[in-house]
Amino acid sequence: MAAGLLSNRVDREDLAVGDHIYSWRAAYIYAHHGIYIGDEMVIHFTRAAGHEIGTGTFLDSFLFSSSPAASSAGDSPPCQRCGHLVRPDGVVMSCLDCFLHGGSLYLFHYGVSPAFFLAKARGGTCTLAASDTGDAVAHRARYLLDKGFGAYSLFKNNCEDFAIYCKTGLLVETAFSVGRSGQLASLTAAFSAVASSPLRFLTTSAGGLAVVTTGLYCVGRYVSDIGVRRDAVKVPVETLVAQTSATATAMEAEVAAETSASAMEAEVTAENSAVAVAADADTVCPPAVDRGS
């Protein structure tokens, strides 16, 4: 673990079933996470290739997915090992090479001490939460590969959230907060530390301001970690899938009801318009009067 303080890089020969691995993307701006299940295969959660954050802007292509579809896109032939497993999005399984997409391999650490956690200034590399056994982790990952992990969300339900859930079985209950992702928690803590208005009243020197800002950043990261959050609860994977399916069914029913209501409203509007047109026609062209008598 001491070596992991400087780098979480690991050789693929040292991987074990159930390991949470990741690889940095776009010059270390963000990382893509997954669960290693053995035989150089990885299960991970992704949005459609080229739509990682779904903003409809150039950022979608900048933050690319690590799905087999992304790796086999363009003129290059599909991967001989996992090309037949291609899915457009959701929970996917791919070989380790496609997952890494040319990047280096890193191991996410669990059950670290508070001192180690704070020493790793970059979020999304470790957590204070303890990991379950490798078999339990692999079971969750395979179950979600078959059943799905819900809708992808950069802030609530991303690839790191998926991997952390598989490792710990922990979910965040609070609706108005970021998910389990250490990357997003780190970013949120940084913005909060810089934007906190009391900073200018706590110190008058540049050095003091840096110390206060660093302190607030560390506190923000620590209280957001899944290992210390009070709103984190253990949820069996079968229960999670059942809840997700029920929510999706309810949303589909709501959308269908809204669509039906809109169709009925449009039909009534069309009928009213037809009646109004007919009334106008009678006004403009009154029936002819018989003057023969």
Which residue ranges define each predicted feature?
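Cysteine-nucleophile amide-bond enzymes
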Residues: 1-293
